[in-house]
Amino acid sequence: MKSATLLALSYLLIALYFLICEAEHSRYEEHEILEENMGDVVNLEQRSCAKPGEMCMRIKCCDGQCGCNRGTGRCFCK
C-alpha cells in the first residue's frame, strides 16, 4: 500500500512539473524561442548554457535546452 501511494505521488509530481513548465513556456515562446530574443540577429552562434532544470532568462527550461548569444549573453529556451 505504501509503495503504491508513493508511486502515485511521484507520478503526480512529475506530471505537475511538466504542466507548470509548459504553462510557463506557452506565455513566452513563439516558434521555439523567447519573444524578447526573436529580433536579435547579432551573434547567431549559440552555445549550451543550461543543465536540465536550470533557469534561462528566469524561465525554467523543461528539457535543459537553452541557447545563448555569445556576444550579448542573452539566453532562450529551445
Swiss-Prot record:
Residues 24-47 form a propeptide. Disulfide bonds join C49-C62, C56-C66, C61-C77. Keywords: Disulfide bond, Ion channel impairing toxin, Knottin, Potassium channel impairing toxin, Secreted, Signal, Toxin, Voltage-gated potassium channel impairing toxin. One of its GO terms (cellular component) is extracellular region. Residues 1-23 form the signal peptide. Its main location: secreted. Expressed by the venom gland. GO terms for molecular function: potassium channel regulator activity; toxin activity. It is found in: Secreted. It comes from the Eukaryota. The presence of a 'disulfide through disulfide knot' structurally defines this protein as a knottin. Belongs to the hainantoxin family. 20 subfamily. Moderately inhibits Kv1.1/KCNA1 and Kv1.2/KCNA2 and weakly inhibits Kv1.3/KCNA3, and Kv2.1/KCNB1 voltage-gated potassium channels. This is Hainantoxin-XX.2. It comes from Cyriopagopus hainanus. The lineage of its organism: Eukaryota, Metazoa, Ecdysozoa, Arthropoda, Chelicerata.
